[in-house]
Amino acid sequence: MKARAEKIADGLYWTGVLDWDIRNYHGYTLQGTTYNAYLVFGDEGVALIDNSYPGTFQELMARMEDAFNREGREMRVDFIVQNHVERDHSGVLVELHRRFPEAEIHCTEVAVEGLLKHYPALEGTEFRTVKTGDSIDLGGRTLTFLEAPLLHWPDSMFTFLDTGILFSNDAFGQHLCYPQRLDTEIPEYILMDAAKKFYANLITPLSKLVLRKFDEVKELGLLDKIGMIAPSHGQIWTEPMKIIEAYTAWATGKVKKKVTVIYDTMHHSTAMMAHAIAEGAMSEGADVRVYYLHEDDRSEIVKDILDSHAIALGAPAIYDEPYPSVGDLLMYLRGLKFNRTGQRRAMVFGSMGGRGGATGTMQKLLADAGFDVMEADEIYYVPNNEELDACFEAGRRLAGDLNE
């Protein structure tokens, strides 16, 4: 096959893979993504930074061949940099090793075990393990490594090219699939929304590590040298401070006067309550988002929770327990640990036909997830006007608390 590499800067090409078709990746909904790989040409050596998902070797190689042809160079890779073990960035490493057997594979020490577990065919391969500050000289260009454990796997690392380009792997990524490669080539609201969704679903529990890593980068004197951030998914940041400032805001829990209302319903009673709560919150001037779990996806929901000061979560009771879709969301929220970016208020609500008690379970699970749970509003069967008025007032109180 034929495919074109995208020249990003002198001696630097994007040689990744466009996945137009993917719609779900480990529970995260998306409209396609990219698996970004980069070829760096020095006077004496060539490095490939990261690779792509299993089954995409031909597309990756076609772009690499185009880059070598345009540079007028023999197709030879001297270094393979594996910033992260996960299969969407290492999935064709075995094929690359067979194609370029002399290429040194550079990764963290923790990554070696993970790569061998994922790819037993690499058993016996000599890996070059690196630590923060280690570097490789390509001839006129130097790649320096920066360990980044748990951003977002224990094996993760960043690679810095001395011309000012940070290859950050998953950090600063977005699940977008556009033929354009740069941040400035697509609408900013689409770019930032995708980056926010990526952070909310993948980086939120690691927020304290994000801030510590920023401090480390400053101490190493690299922050002012970063002129471009090239992540492993989505667009390349040519204005890197834009995403660094956004990550700082998200990691420190900067929120808006905003209430996210989330519910599921069987016979529309809980839906009536949800809409009344939303109206109450809006009456206090809050920005409000309403999600219906029967139709809406949790990865979109948590994107709005990220910058909300409060949430309202509603479910009908089934045998005195929350509706299953709400239980699923509660487990997801517990894993994301939103309290690590500051505590958010929460209320729970729902309708019941028996003894009730589902709201008590929801309160406990939300507290376990790090939310400051205020109150529960549970009604019997269909809410009457008086009960809907009470829901409206609950929404007002929830939004009013944002002014405290």
UniProtKB/Swiss-Prot annotation:
Keyword tags: Electron transport, Flavoprotein, FMN, Iron, Metal-binding, Oxidoreductase, Transport
Cofactor(s) it depends on: FMN; Fe cation
Top-tier EC class: oxidoreductase
Cofactor binding summary note: Binds 1 FMN per subunit.
Residue sites binding FMN per the record: 265-270, 317-320, 351-356
Family per similarity comment: In the N-terminal section; belongs to the zinc metallo-hydrolase group 3 family.
PANTHER family registered for this protein in UniProt: ANAEROBIC NITRIC OXIDE REDUCTASE FLAVORUBREDOXIN
CDD domains reported in the protein's UniProt record: flavodiiron_proteins_MBL-fold (cd07709)
Conditions for induction: By iron limitation.
Gene Ontology terms, MF aspect: electron transfer activity; FMN binding; metal ion binding; oxidoreductase activity
Domain Flavodoxin-like: 259-399
Upper lineage: Archaea, Methanobacteriati, Methanobacteriota, Methanomada group, Methanobacteria
Family matches, as Pfam families: Flavodoxin_1, ODP
Protein name: Coenzyme F420H(2) oxidase
This enzyme's EC code(s): 1.5.3.22
Annotated binding of Fe cation 1, by residue: 84, 86, 152, 170
InterPro entries given in the database record: Flavodoxin/NO_synth, Flavoprotein-like_sf, Metallo-B-lactamas, ODP_dom, RibonucZ/Hydroxyglut_hydro, Rubredoxin-O_OxRdtase
Binding sites annotated in the UniProt record for Fe cation 2: 88-89, 170, 233
Its biological purpose: Catalyzes the oxidation of F420H(2) with O(2). May be involved in O(2) detoxification, reducing the intracellular O(2) concentration to a level allowing growth at the expense of methane formation.
SUPFAM superfamilies, sorted: Flavoproteins, Metallo-hydrolase/oxidoreductase
Organism of this sequence: Methanothermobacter thermautotrophicus (strain ATCC 29096 / DSM 1053 / JCM 10044 / NBRC 100330 / Delta H)
Reaction(s) catalysed (UniProt annotation): 2 reduced coenzyme F420-(gamma-L-Glu)(n) + O2 = 2 oxidized coenzyme F420-(gamma-L-Glu)(n) + 2 H2O + 2 H(+)
